[in-house]
């Protein structure tokens, strides 16, 4: 409505439509090293998640089988309690009849109280393990399904012949440390490449017009090709500092990897030695259980024949139950040690990223070897 000469300025509309492409020749491998470092970091994070999952699985299994061991010992404690109650009743009767001194009845009551105390402790341990199991599973104790007592699993007495480096190398924490070293190596390569010239080229093509109606005409076409050369001349100090940091991070990653491997080897050796010791103790304990079972059978036979009273067979039964309880404890230790050994060996973890990389390398070699 008002002419532009009276306003002191003018305006116009401009329409632009285009695309831009930039290509870095990456002669020194900086971009490739940066990409590989990021991928290695992602693989390390995945391995760390697997390590956390393995730790959780081990805690759940160890707590569950600990609860089963408490249940097995509670069953033996019930039998021991019934045996000791029967023995205490006989002792009280003999004191009333004047056959024994009151001290014998007091001894029987003390032994009965010891069995009752052990049973209360086992009940408390089972309840604590159940609460711990619910916490590990992320549910409230009342939401945990009802657990049923089951026999403890059989544990093979021995360890795999290849329980050394072959299986240790599968541990997720070692895999994570290895990927961290790989990432640090790639970051060091990228920092080294910063010292060399960087050549890139940019291309732009599109349409530009101050008249929207003429945007798609031939006269509105634009094109530009711009080469660029970066010479790291004036920032040598910063590049040296960055390279020094990368080298320090690489040294730290290597030290962490060495520490992880040594710790894993020590853990496996400790658990394997513990498994061997428990296996030897279980052999001795089975002999003691069998011997005590034979003593119980002999005492029961004498009681049936009237040669001895029932107290001898009750004492023999109490001792037999004690030996069985010790055997259950050793079996529980064997299960716990076996679980710890499985965890120390990586729990069957396989580094899929490393396997894929090895498969790709094998395929490349095979393809290159074909005529």
PLM regions with names:
Residues 148, 290-315, 339-356:
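A glycine-biased, small/acidic residue-tolerant capping/turn segment at secondary-structure junctions
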Residues 31, 40, 47-163, 274, ...:
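Periplasmic alpha-helical coiled-coil/stalk elements that build and connect Gram-negative outer-membrane
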Residues 25-53, 79, 103, 107, ...:
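Sec/SRP-type N-terminal targeting helices
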Residues 155, 264, 305, 326-371:
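Acidic, low-complexity, intrinsically disordered peripheral segments
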Residues 1-20, 143-160, 189, 202-242, ...:
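Small/polar, glycine/serine/threonine/aspartate-rich low-complexity segments that form flexible
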Residues 14-16, 128, 162, 196:
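Extracytoplasmic
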């Amino acid at each position: 409505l008002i002419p532009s000469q009276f306003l002191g300025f003018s305006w116009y509309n401009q329409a632009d439509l285009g695309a831009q492409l930039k290509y870095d020749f990456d002669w020194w491998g900086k971009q490739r090293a940066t990409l590989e470092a990021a991928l290695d970091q992602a693989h390390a994070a995945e391995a760390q998640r697997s390590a956390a999952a393995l730790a959780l699985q081990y805690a759940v299994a160890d707590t569950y089988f600990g609860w089963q061991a408490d249940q097995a010992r509670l069953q033996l404690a019930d039998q021991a309690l019934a045996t000791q109650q029967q023995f205490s009743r006989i002792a009280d009767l003999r004191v009333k009849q004047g056959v024994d001194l009151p001290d014998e009845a007091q001894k029987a009551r003390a032994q009965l109280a010891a069995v009752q105390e052990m049973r209360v402790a086992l009940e408390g341990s089972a309840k604590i393990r159940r609460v711990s199991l619910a916490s590990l599973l992320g549910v409230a104790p009342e939401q945990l399904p009802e657990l049923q007592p089951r026999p403890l699993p059989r544990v093979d007495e021995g360890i795999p012949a290849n329980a050394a480096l072959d299986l240790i190398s599968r541990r997720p924490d070692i895999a994570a440390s290895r990927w961290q070293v790989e990432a640090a190596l790639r970051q060091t390569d990228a920092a080294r490449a910063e010292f060399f010239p960087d050549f890139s080229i940019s291309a732009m093509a599109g349409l530009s017009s101050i008249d929207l109606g003429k945007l798609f005409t031939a006269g509105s076409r634009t094109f530009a090709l711009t080469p660029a050369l970066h010479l790291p001349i004036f920032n040598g100090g910063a590049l040296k500092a960055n390279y020094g940091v990368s080298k320090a991070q690489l040294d730290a990653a290597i030290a962490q990897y060495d520490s992880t491997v040594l710790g894993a080897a020590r853990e496996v050796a400790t658990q394997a030695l513990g498994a061997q010791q428990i296996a030897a103790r279980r052999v001795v304990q089975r002999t003691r259980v069998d011997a005590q079972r034979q003593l119980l059978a002999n005492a029961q036979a004498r009681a049936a024949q009237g040669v001895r009273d029932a107290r001898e067979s009750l004492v023999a039964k109490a001792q037999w139950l004690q030996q069985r309880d010790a055997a259950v404890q050793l079996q529980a230790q064997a299960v716990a040690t076996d679980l710890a050994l499985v965890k120390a060996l990586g729990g069957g973890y396989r580094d899929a990223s490393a396997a894929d990389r090895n498969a790709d390398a094998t395929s490349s070699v095979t393809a290159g070897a074909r005529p």
